[in-house]
């Protein structure tokens, strides 16, 4: 069977659902889906050892020092 024929690969316009974009329930559902996906991508980056920072920021190399190092306002353990 050839899967590259037009009838097998394209959907007719009748199958596409018409969803109102101003529906509050649809907006809430979309926000939950987006938040879940962003969390998934963040966990994936952390697991692979990458950082989500785009440049040196507070606590990063050359930064102002945060909770992990540098001149912070926390206890030094002396």
Swiss-Prot record:
The record marks 38 as: Crucial for interaction with calmodulin. Residues 38-78 are annotated as: Disordered. The keyword Transport does not apply. Is highly enriched in brain. Accumulates postsynaptically in dendritic spines of neostriatal neurons. GO terms for molecular function: calmodulin binding. Residues 26-49 form the IQ domain. Residues 50-78 form the Collagen-like domain. The keyword Phosphoprotein applies. The modification N-acetylmethionine is found at residue 1. The modification Citrulline is found at residue 68. The modification Omega-N-methylarginine is found at residue 68. Acts as a 'third messenger' substrate of protein kinase C-mediated molecular cascades during synaptic development and remodeling. Binds to calmodulin in the absence of calcium. Neurogranin is intrinsically unstructured; however, upon binding with CaM, The IQ domain adopts a helical conformation. Belongs to the neurogranin family. This is Neurogranin. The lineage of its organism: Eukaryota, Metazoa, Chordata, Craniata, Vertebrata.
